[in-house]
C-alpha cells in the first residue's frame, strides 16, 4: 500500500516511509529495519546502514519500482494531450479516453498514478541517500560504492522532479536535507534542485559503458541539456496559466538565452565524450531484440529495464497499448477490436508522406499495412478500414513478433537517445539565432533518415524534426508546453479527414468501421472543443487511495 506523501510533518528532515514495497527492499538491504503490516510506517532513521556496496546499490534500485509502472502511463498524458494520439481503452469514461478528450480531472487515474509514483520514488531516493551516507561514515561502503549508489539515486530523483515540473508546474521540493511535501516552490527552486542533483550525478557516475540501463555521466549530462532547454523556454508560472486557463489562447513564447547556452554546453559534453553515436538503422532502435543497446551502436543513453508483467512492478505496455489486438481489423475473417491507443487519423501519416515521402523513419513510425506472420495475410491500417498503427509499438525484431510481445510487455523503455542530445543542441542554437551552427547536429538526423539536409534549419523545421524523430516517445505535449503552442497545435485536428461532420459521406464503411470512425470523429471534435489554457498543466491529483494531498490545485481545475 502506498502512503499519502502529503500528510506527514517535517522535522528538519523529511522522513516518509513506504510500506509494503519499500519494507521488502529494506528487510534485505538494511541492518536495522522492521517489516510492518499494511498501512503502518516503516521508519528509516539516521542509524540505518547497509552492509556493503552491493546492498547500497540494491537499495537505490528499489526506486525503479516506481518507474516501471509509468513506462506506458506517460503516453496516456504526454501523447494523448496532443493532435497525434487518441485512446479507446475501455469505456469512454475510462482514464485513457478522458485524457484523449482533454477531460482530465483530479481523480483521473493516469494523473494520479504518475504524480504519486514519481513522488514516492523521490521519497525512496531520499531515504536511500540518507542510509548510504550513514553507511559511508560507518565504513560499510567504499567510496566507489557510494558514488555509484548515490549518483544513481540523485539521477533518478532529478528525472522525477523534471517530469513533475514539466507536467504540473511549481511542485513541492523535499530531499534528505528537508523540505515540504505540500508547499509549491517557484521554478528557480525546482530547477535549482534538479540541476544540483544532476551535477552531483555527473561527478559521481562513471562514463557510459554501453549498458543504458545503468545511469552514466553522459546520461546526467544529457538530462542537464534537456533541463536547461526546458527551463530556457521559460515555463509558464501559475499566474500566467491562470490568465489563460479558460481560454483557447496560447501565451507568447519567451526564452532565457543564458539557459539555452547551458543546454548547448551540456549537449557538447555528451557529444565530445565520444561515447555515443547514432545507430545506423533507425528501425532497429525499437523492440525486444534491439532494446538497451543490444546491437552495441550506443544510441540508447538511458533506458528503464523491463522483464515483463510477472517480473516487474509493471511491464512496459507501450507495445500492448498500441497493438493490443493484432490484426483484428475485420479483414480476412478476423474480428474487429479497437486498440488502447490509436493514431489520431490518417493525416498524421499523410502530412509526413507528402512532405518527405522517402523519410526512412516514416515506415517504422506509422504502419498502414502489416502482414500477419502466422497466416501470410496482409492487413490494411488506413481508412476506411482503420487508422495507421504506431509502429514503434509493434515489435518486429523477432519471429512472429506482432503476436508475442503484447503478452510479455518486456521491452525496455527508452528515456534518452543520443538523437535527443543532437536535437537539443540544434534547437538551442536556432533559438539563439545561430541557425548555421545548428545545421551540423540537425543534419545528422536527416542524413540517417535519408532526406535532404539544410544549411540553416528554421525553428519550424526543428519542431517538425521532433515529430519525425520522436513520435510516440513521450515528447509531444512537453514540447507544446515549451513552445507555447498547445492550443494551436491541438486545434490542427480540424483539418483531419474525419473531423468534419460529413466524414461518413466521403467513404463507404462496414458497420464496425463506421463505429470506429465515429469514435475517431468524436475524439477529434472533443480535442478541438475542450483544449484550454489550463491544459498547460495537469490537475494536481488525489493520492493513490483518493485522499487529498494538501497541494494547491492548478488553475482552471
Spans of model-derived segments:
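Short, surface-exposed recognition loops and adjoining beta-strand edges that mediate ligand/DNA contacts
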Residues: 74-91, 206-222, 233-325, 451-463, ...
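C-terminal motif of bacterial Sec signal peptides marking the signal peptidase cleavage site
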Residues: 29-32
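Bacterial signal peptide processing site
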Residues: 34-37
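Elongated scaffold/linker segments in the mid-to-C-terminal portions of large proteins
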Residues: 53-55, 60, 64, 68-71, ...
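Conserved, well-structured interaction surfaces
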Residues: 52-71, 92-168, 178-192, 196-212, ...
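Short coil/turn linking the two alpha-helices of tandem helical-hairpin repeats
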Residues: 165-167, 172, 209, 230-239, ...
Amino acid at each position: 500500500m502506498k502512503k499519502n506523501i502529503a500528510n506527514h510533518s517535517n522535522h528538519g528532515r523529511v522522513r516518509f516511509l513506504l510500506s509494503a514495497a519499500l519494507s521488502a527492499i529494506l528487510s534485505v538491504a538494511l541492518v536495522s529495519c522492521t517489516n510492518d503490516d499494511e498501512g503502518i510506517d516503516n521508519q528509516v532513521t539516521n542509524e540505518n546502514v547497509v552492509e556493503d556496496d552491493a546492498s547500497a546499490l540494491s537499495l537505490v534500485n528499489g526506486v525503479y519500482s516506481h518507474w516501471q509502472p509509468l513506462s506506458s502511463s506517460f503516453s496516456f498524458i504526454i501523447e494523448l494531450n496532443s493532435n497525434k494520439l487518441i485512446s479507446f481503452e475501455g469505456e469512454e469514461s475510462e482514464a485513457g479516453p478522458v485524457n484523449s478528450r482533454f477531460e482530465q480531472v483530479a481523480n483521473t487515474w493516469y494523473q494520479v498514478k504518475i504524480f504519486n509514483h514519481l513522488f514516492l520514488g523521490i521519497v525512496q531516493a531520499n531515504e536511500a541517500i540518507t542510509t548510504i551516507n550513514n553507511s559511508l561514515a560507518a565504513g560499510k561502503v567504499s567510496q566507489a560504492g557510494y558514488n555509484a549508489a548515490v549518483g544513481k539515486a540523485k539521477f533518478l530523483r532529478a528525472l522525477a522532479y523534471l517530469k513533475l515540473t514539466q507536467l504540473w508546474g511549481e511542485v513541492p521540493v523535499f530531499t534528505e536535507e528537508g523540505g515540504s511535501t505540500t508547499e509549491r516552490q517557484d521554478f528557480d527552486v525546482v530547477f535549482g534542485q534538479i540541476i544540483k542533483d544532476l551535477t552531483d550525478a555527473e561527478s559521481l557516475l562513471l562514463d557510459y559503458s554501453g549498458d543504458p540501463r545503468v545511469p552514466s555521466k553522459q546520461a546526467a549530462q544529457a538530462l542537464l541539456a534537456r533541463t536547461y532547454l526546458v527551463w530556457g523556454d521559460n515555463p509558464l508560472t501559475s499566474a500566467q496559466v491562470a490568465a489563460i486557463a479558460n481560454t483557447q489562447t496560447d501565451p507568447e513564447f519567451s526564452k532565457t538565452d543564458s539557459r539555452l547556452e547551458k543546454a548547448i554546453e551540456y549537449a557538447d559534453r555528451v557529444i565530445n565524450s565520444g561515447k555515443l553515436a547514432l545507430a545506423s538503422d533507425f528501425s532497429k532502435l525499437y523492440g525486444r531484440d534491439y532494446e538497451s543497446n543490444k546491437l552495441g551502436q550506443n544510441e540508447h543513453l538511458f533506458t528503464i529495464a523491463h522483464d515483463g508483467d510477472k517480473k516487474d512492478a509493471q511491464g512496459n505496455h507501450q507495445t500492448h497499448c498500441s497493438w493490443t489486438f493484432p490484426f483484428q481489423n475485420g479483414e480476412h475473417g478476423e474480428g474487429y477490436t479497437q486498440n488502447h491507443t490509436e493514431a489520431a487519423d490518417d493525416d498524421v501519416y499523410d502530412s509526413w508522406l507528402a512532405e518527405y515521402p522517402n523519410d526512412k523513419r516514416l515506415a517504422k513510425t506509422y504502419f498502414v499495412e502489416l502482414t500477419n506472420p502466422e497466416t501470410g495475410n496482409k492487413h490494411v491500417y488506413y481508412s476506411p478500414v482503420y487508422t495507421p498503427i504506431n509502429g514503434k509499438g509493434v515489435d518486429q525484431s523477432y519471429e512472429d513478433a506482432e503476436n508475442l510481445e503484447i503478452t510479455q510487455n518486456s521491452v525496455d523503455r527508452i528515456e534518452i537517445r543520443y538523437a535527443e542530445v543532437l536535437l537539443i543542441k540544434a534547437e538551442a542554437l536556432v533559438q539563439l539565432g545561430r541557425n548555421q551552427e545548428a545545421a551540423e547536429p540537425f543534419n545528422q538526423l536527416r542524413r540517417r533518415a535519408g532526406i535532404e539536409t539544410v544549411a540553416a534549419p528554421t525553428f519550424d523545421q526543428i519542431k517538425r524534426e521532433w515529430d519525425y524523430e520522436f513520435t510516440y516517445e513521450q515528447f509531444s505535449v512537453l514540447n507544446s508546453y515549451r513552445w507555447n503552442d498547445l492550443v494551436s497545435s491541438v486545434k490542427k485536428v480540424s483539418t483531419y479527414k474525419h473531423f468534419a461532420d460529413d466524414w461518413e459521406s466521403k467513404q463507404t464503411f462496414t458497420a464496425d468501421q463506421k463505429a470506429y470512425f465515429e469514435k475517431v470523429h468524436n475524439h477529434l471534435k472533443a480535442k478541438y472543443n475542450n483544449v484550454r489554457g489550463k491544459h498547460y498543466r495537469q490537475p494536481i491529483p488525489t493520492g493513490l487511495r483518493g485522499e487529498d494531498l494538501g497541494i494547491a490545485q492548478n488553475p482552471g481545475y
